[in-house]
């Protein structure tokens, strides 16, 4: 219950109590007696509830209890507002029966039942909630019990007071009469009223206290209730908070669960995607690998198809090249035929001129003989006379100039001057004339030389490397036995008979008809010519050198002059010997290029070559030339007695001359010169073989001993190459011999040095050269097989022979050295070993060719030993034939040759490597093959060529057989043949290189061969030295060689092949006629 409710209840109770208290009417007595006082009495009667309560309390407790019970009962049956007294008057004798109107005791007691009832029954809106009912009921019960007790007490008090009041009033009535008693009563009543008031006040205080207590209880209860409510609310809030938290937790958990599920789904999705991606990549990789594999297969297939296509194209190209080569060869053959006709006409003219020359020579010789007889007592005077005669002969000889060109376009030498060399004696004159004629004839290259025919003297360039060799070694026309040579020289049989003595003619025939003449003849002529050649060589060389010394060959360096002076000192004997034994050598005496040509380079080179051969020290002039020349000189020595003799004659290849062996001035007397040059040359040869490089170095040094030949091959890019048809083995040997100096060069170097030294010093009889040649031939034949080795061995033989020969070493030194073991040596001196295959002249031409080849080979040895292989291969019969062809020095550009040379050069340029060797080899092989055609032509065109033609045909057949074998081998070893080509020379030619070179060179080879065959037919050179112009460098590329060959100043070039050699190579076939022309 709220405090407000409690206070309301208290007021209600008080109201009830007030209603229940009824005061009776004032006693009448009172009213009457005390009118005014009555009012005061009424006033004194308690009006307020407190008063009533105080009166009630004064009622006796019994009464109050009774009343309570009664009032209780009545209250239950009537509204609380009505007083119970009206309905049931109290029984008499009780306090309730007291009528207050009359007596104060009659005042009915207060009935508090209604208040109790009201208190017990609260309005609906004030009822406590069920939760609190229990507490409130207990509170009310306590509260009402206490109130009831208080009311009962109050009633008792009231009743007692009323009773007392009645007693008092009764007493008053009793004592009314007396005022005193009345005032006393009033005082007592007043006291009672005061006491009642006090009691009422006390009661009121109690009631107030009770109310406060109740209020406190109520407030406490309210507080407790609020606290409870707050607690409940807090609990509720906590519950709600817990529920909210739980909800949040559930939500969070749910969210986390969903997040986890989502994450798992994403992870699963990712893994699935990754797996799909991986599978996709694997599939792509697989496809890519498959594609790559397929592409690789396609590429491999394409490559295979491309390779097949390339092979087919290569095969077609090769076939086309072969066809083109064949066509070129045919063209060359046709051209050679035309050139042969031209050459024959030119030879006829030359023969006529030579007849005149021979006549003049004969007269000169007779005059010289007479002078010699007259001055025989005085050697010095005799020497001077010979020098004078030599000069006269030289003067009488009209130089002839010709142009050397390689191919149609490239001109190696715009103008080559050949000055005829006339022997000092009549013999020399004749030989010189003959040689001159031979040179002129041989120089169909001489068409350019207007003076060729007019000159009666043999040009000092005994060998025209351009492909023309002097017809024979004979110093005099008489010595020329070869009909081919005669035809080349334009000499008739009568003219030839007019030539120098038969001994010379024997030698020259040996050399000239070395091809056509039987081996016996060549051997006989060789023997005779050995002595004659040595003597003639010495005389011619000395004369030449004297002329050079005296300024005839002003272009010669001092070396030429020195040798000339030396020669002059020793010339008398040398010259005579040369004339007598000169046969081929004297005839082939080569005018020093320096003398002949103003070009300092040519001169220096030629001279250097001369000296390099004769006096290597002098040779220093042109180190490159010297380098090559020593080897060339060595080669020349090894090549053939002719070439060697030419070398001995101090002939050198003029640097400017495409390929001329020009006499290099002897250092001293022919003997001393030869010994000097011979030893140097031998050393050089040996050195050049072992030292091709050394030879080159020596040449450069110029101190190198000149080759005993006295011939310095002019050093150019090209080297003379002697082509003998040989087996591939022979070719290889020849290659090694020439190129490596293993075959020819080494022996040449060794032999030349030893034999030259010995020959020069010993000056053994010219026979020794013959023997040496013979030995060389014998040795050379084997050396064909193993040319490099054999050539060395043969060279030593040559040396020993040369040593034996030393009396005439100067003349014969060349033969001694010339018996180039590789090829030239064998055929040169003693055709006997080869007679079966060749006439002595043939062998001689071979020898000269070999000697030249050797020189060339040595030169080419410097280059790469290309030539060596060629000569070594040729050492066989085929070799000799090839040698003959080789002996032609294709270098000299005879007009008809120039064209073929140019073609061959072009061809070589096209196929340089093959041409370099192949043209040589192929030219040789072709010479053998084409040789028959050329030989036939030559035979048909030349009367004296019948025998040579037969020999050549035989050789040609052999060569063709060899060529077929070589070609087969070359084809088989085509891949490896480049080296072999050099080594195999001829066989290489047949090989692919051969095809290539032949394609490039076939023209040259065919032309050379044909020309050589023609030359061989002419057989002016007993040993046809087929000098093929080969790259001194074994490197097959002929184009380079050609370019090198072209420059006349190439002497400096280390590649020893002179330009003329290159031409010779290119023109190998065309030059097949050259050896004969040279002869």
From Swiss-Prot:
Residues 1-293, 308-327, 341-383, 420-453, 493-522, 606-639, 658-1054 are annotated as: Disordered. Residues 1-11, 64-76, 159-293, 896-930, 944-983, 994-1016 have a biased composition (Basic and acidic residues). Residues 420-434, 670-682, 756-781, 984-993, 1020-1033 have a biased composition (Polar residues). Residues 36-45, 140-158, 684-695 have a biased composition (Acidic residues). InterPro entries: Actin_dynamics_regulator, DUF4592. This is Capping protein inhibiting regulator of actin dynamics. The keyword Cytoplasm applies. Residues 115-134 have a biased composition (Basic residues). Involved in epithelial cell integrity by acting on the maintenance of the actin cytoskeleton. Positively regulates the actin polymerization, by inhibiting the interaction of actin-capping proteins with actin. It is found in: Cytoplasm, Cytosol. It comes from Danio rerio (Zebrafish). GO terms for cellular component: cytosol.
